[in-house]
Structure formats: C-alpha cells, structure tokens
Amino acid sequence: MDRTFVMVKPDGVQRGLVGEIVSRFEAKGLKLVGAKLELLPEGRVVEQYREHLEKPFFPGLKAYIMSGPCFLMAWEGKGVVAVVRRMVGATNPAEAAPGSIRGNFALDIGRNVIHASDSPESAARELGIHFAAGELVDYSRIDEPVLYE
C-alpha cells in the first residue's frame, strides 16, 4: 500500500482544524499510520522546503512554519498521494475547488492550512524527514476488505 506525508500548518492547528482534516481522510477510507504535533526546528523546515530555498518567499514561509505547532501525519492507501492532493485542493486557495480542504478553509496562499506530498518520491523523502522508522505503525483497518478489491 502507498504512503504519503501530510502536515497541518500552524494556521490550521491554531484554528482547530486538525480533527476536521483527520476525519475527512478517515471517512475517505485512508489509514493513519503516524501522527505527531511538533514545533519544527529550522533544519527540518529547510530540508522540507529545499526546492524553495532560493525563492523570494522562502524566508516568510520558513518563519510561518516555525511560528507554531504543526500536526504531522503519515497516511496509507491505494493511490494515496493523488487522493490526498485532490482532497487538499490547489495550493492557491482562490483556485481550490469548493469542498476541498483549502477550498473550504483557506483564504490566502501564504496561509493555506495544509501541506501534502506531490509525488510518491516526495512522500518518501518527506516521511523520512519527519518520521523515524519505528514511528509508523503497520496494522489493518477493519473495513479494508470492503474498501479494496
């Protein structure tokens, strides 16, 4: 089964959206295999967003991510990276579909509530940044036989 990394950013945590976001993914049939609430240190923020290091918005992004706790999650499911990205919505909330997480809860591209890996390769890299090997749990959901062929 595939895995992906999802992070509720400080604005989402501070607005009390963690439960709503977890509920949406669970209702879809995805399996939560790791979760923790953390104040991210600078080194991990830089590693997480390394593709943006030279962009003019990076200092603000780094300060924002470090401004409060983030809720880090590992999710598992068939095609989970694409499923989660669709549920999260476009990076720019103005372009996010109504009903998506960003479409419903975000107003500003700089405070867009949530991060989700954009490819299986990014998911593996980001999970490795934020979770140690023993922190992810293998188990079966009782409804898996109903969800998957």
From Swiss-Prot:
PROSITE patterns: NDPK, NDPK_LIKE. It catalyses: a 2'-deoxyribonucleoside 5'-diphosphate + ATP = a 2'-deoxyribonucleoside 5'-triphosphate + ADP; a ribonucleoside 5'-diphosphate + ATP = a ribonucleoside 5'-triphosphate + ADP. Belongs to the NDK family. ATP binds at K9, F57, R85, T91, R102, N112. It comes from the Archaea. Its main location: cytoplasm. It is an enzyme of class 2 (transferase). HAMAP family: NDP_kinase. It is found in: Cytoplasm. One of its GO terms (molecular function) is ATP binding. It comes from Methanoculleus marisnigri (strain ATCC 35101 / DSM 1498 / JR1). PANTHER family: NUCLEOSIDE DIPHOSPHATE KINASE (PTHR11349). One of its GO terms (biological process) is CTP biosynthetic process. Keywords: ATP-binding, Cytoplasm, Kinase, Magnesium, Metal-binding, Nucleotide metabolism, Nucleotide-binding, Phosphoprotein, Transferase. Its cofactor is Mg(2+). Major role in the synthesis of nucleoside triphosphates other than ATP. The ATP gamma phosphate is transferred to the NDP beta phosphate via a ping-pong mechanism, using a phosphorylated active-site intermediate. This is Nucleoside diphosphate kinase. Its EC number is 2.7.4.6.
